[in-house]
Amino acid sequence: AQACPYNAIAHLKRPCKFSCPVNAITYDEHGISVIDKKKCIRCGKCIHSCPFGAIGSKSFIVDVINALREGKHIYAMAAPATEGQFGDDITMASWKNAMKELGFTDFFDVGLGGDMTAAYESEEWAEAYKAGEKKVTSCCPAFVNMVRLHYPDLADCVSTTVSPMCAVSRLIKARDPEAIT
């Protein structure tokens, strides 16, 4: 910009690029943002920071609707925080009733997975502590991706316990082999 006395050269900060914690967003020769899939940890920060909605996550709503219409065993899962998103009258029980009314086979509170994860991970961490090893949590898939892609030397420190969502999904599939979560 200093090379041009008329300030005709502008470099605008793009929220998506500057929100990316691993610098996975660059620009091509036409100035179009490009996400480097080999660096991206799939945290979603770019999606939430883009004021134009230019970056989006894949929606499976049509797939879910089609599966419900076909009578497949579709299970809904939600984190306990959703209970507070829609007012005092909404509870996990009302969520469950609503999902079943929409055609879902059943509804599970992912808080159950948090309890399962805490139980398994505490055992794993106790063993690591006895062995003098360090451990970090594996509950956040984006964090696990970041460690594997950008800090591979620390990959052995990541707990092998699955996320709460995955734990509940596995529980459902153990109970119903035809389940889709």
Indicate residue ranges for each PLM-predicted region.
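Iron-sulfur cluster-binding cysteine motifs and their immediate structural context
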Residues: 1-41, 45-61
